[in-house]
Amino acid sequence: MANSAQAKKRARQNVKARKHNASLRSMVRTYIKRTVNAIAAGDYTVATEAYKKAVPVIDRMADKGIIHKNKAARHKSRLNAQVKALASN
């Protein structure tokens, strides 16, 4: 348990930040799921729109450090490959 006033304040701030970061991570997952579901449904136009909406969100969360930049790149790359594969079918 934190003893100093500074440590107690940091503990309070960390709780608040953890809740906020969890919300942002959830938002990223939601955008990714929307894209994946559109791809699974086989609808190219919906999948493309979902992907275009997801990319800036993924990038923004990587910039903020919510997700690692390599993880963001991996998600974007895999989603883009799936959307392109859907276009060729």
UniProtKB/Swiss-Prot annotation:
Family: Belongs to the bacterial ribosomal protein bS20 family.
Highest taxon in the source lineage: Bacteria
UniProt gene name: rpsT
Gene3D superfamilies linked to this entry: Ribosomal protein S20
Organism: Acinetobacter baylyi (strain ATCC 33305 / BD413 / ADP1)
Lineage: Bacteria, Pseudomonadati, Pseudomonadota, Gammaproteobacteria, Moraxellales
Entry's Gene Ontology molecular function annotations: small ribosomal subunit rRNA binding; structural constituent of ribosome
Protein name: Small ribosomal subunit protein bS20
Disordered: region residues: 1-21
A Pfam family this chain is assigned to: Ribosomal_S20p
Ranges of Basic residues composition bias in the record: 7-21
